[in-house]
Amino acid sequence: MTPPASPGVLYIVSAPSGAGKTSLVKALLKSDPAIRLSVSHTTRAPRPGESDGRDYHFVARDTFEKMLADGEFLEHAEVYGNFYGTSRGRIGQELDAGRDLLLEIDWQGAEQVKRHFPQSTSIFILPPTFSALRTRLTGRGQDSPEIIERRLAAAAHDVAHAEAFDYIIVNDDFDHALQDLVAITRSIRLEAQRQLKRHAALFGEFRRI
């Protein structure tokens, strides 16, 4: 008889806009195929290089509002006038089957998910300095000066909630920050209770001696 799978890990990664969260998450997923990205729904327009179903499920506002009214979202939030939400979908089923999932959401969403999945692992990404964040946002060339100022003000509010997370990574060097992110995922997998379930047959051999 096949032993029950060890439950998957739900990782929550949050950061202020411009901290490098998306790039770090993409690099992590590339280095560790065992972790799957849970794709969120959003009403905002796709950015250059983004595609529907890979980066986000891009939907119209009325579609999002209907899904929200039908209770289809595990968490949702409004950011800069756009809505974001994580579909309940198969998250529970995926975790029960032993698959690791990653949610790339803001602190408000992280708070909601933690209430439903208290065993999830939350990670907050910090920029090295406030001025570095301003430089990154300006360098993207995507927003007007007014929008950048709004993002910087929101960043200060986001960072005020960092203490609620399990881990905090300062992205002052991309490679080092990625190493820190990978180290967290590896350490979670090596927790004793997870290893006991994952290698139940091995421990069983020694108990029979």
Curated annotation (Swiss-Prot):
Domain Guanylate kinase-like residue range list: 8-186
GO molecular function: ATP binding; guanylate kinase activity
Recorded catalytic activity of this chain's protein: GMP + ATP = GDP + ADP
EC code: 2.7.4.8
Binding sites annotated in the UniProt record for ATP: A15, P16, S17, G18, A19, G20, K21, T22
Pfam families from the UniProt entry: Guanylate_kin
Keywords per UniProt: ATP-binding, Cytoplasm, Kinase, Nucleotide-binding, Transferase
Subcellular localization(s) per the UniProt record: Cytoplasm
InterPro entries: GK/Ca_channel_bsu, Guanylate_kin-like_dom, Guanylate_kinase, Guanylate_kinase_CS, P-loop_NTPase
Domain of life of the organism encoding this protein: Bacteria
GO CC annotations, alphabetized: cytosol
Functional description taken from the UniProt entry: Essential for recycling GMP and indirectly, cGMP.
Family of the protein in this entry: Belongs to the guanylate kinase family.
Name of this chain's protein: Guanylate kinase
